[in-house]
């Protein structure tokens, strides 16, 4: 029997391990920390009984991913996938494409024309090479978010799109930022923005259980300092860490990490008191106001500036729909903004000020908070280099050359050694596809 070693137990590493085990390979996973999960861990970060997702929280790309097919996970679907707060109003990303379009007034037809091709093509959009075969309507994803926003007449449509495009962690004037916005809008219409009951940890726990069922093993508190001997070695690590393990100092030269996250978790005495009632019907709320406000916020970390008074903030409030997250009558919330890589400032007031802007009285409900700065993210997960939680800057070049421009970028210069982290295609997000792709290449080479 062939033997494979996987370094790292995040969703990509475990997805790779499960694929290999299904094909009859004996797999050992090594995890440096004492718990598995990578970017999908859940813990009591504030007060006893309040369970918070340490990194990933809502997983719009996970449920239909072939990497997670057949797992026993209880998914929760809020009535509205996501919403965007405006001063005195809000705009919603509904489950239905037409429902969303209907809320955009004069931009209904434009929104539908932009997003519907992505909805129709969704099952085919798991390979980075699909862009070579896409219809012109889908190639719009290579444009900047600003270019797409110019097609809208209303502030509501521009703001809704900006909030989704900001997940790219790119300036909204940069090429390919539109693709992230269009993809996430389409995800809402294809399958909602769901999350696992109990926390994102449930996803990796299900992957781990499947691996053990298939005869694999997981060793925690097992830091790897040199590449082990095996028929195949798959590394769910950052390119710089792979360069260290492989003793290839030039391997990661030129690979760039993007801005970092600054995150707060709150234990709350009551739900967030949103001024707009519709924001209480979703788990995901984008705070940032207009397109212009969000564009300015997302430009700042690329220019080395910390957040201003009104940063773009992503808020997740799972306890409205998942009573396992907090004691009876209490609630949790999770929020982050983008800051420069390795930034050592404090964005607490800026983030809480944005929440207060749209939910007056919020601060009075905070029982306890947990703060995660860029250095905390990297300490928690070595793949989050400098606090970058998406595996590397999502520039147009690095979407193609991730981490290097090669026909099969999961292969490394070493035989039978592969990279399977979010620093390989198709990139960041909880979908397991980086690991699945690397495992498929490894299986081909093992035959």
Regions from the language model: what does each represent?
Residues 158-171, 310-314, 361-425:
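A glycine-rich dinucleotide-binding beta-alpha-beta segment and adjacent secondary-structure elements
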Residues 216, 220-326:
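Mid-domain catalytic core of redox enzymes
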Residues 110, 271-272, 301, 305-309, ...:
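Flavin-binding catalytic cores
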Residues 2-124:
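N-terminal glycine-rich phosphate/pyrophosphate-binding loop and immediately adjacent elements
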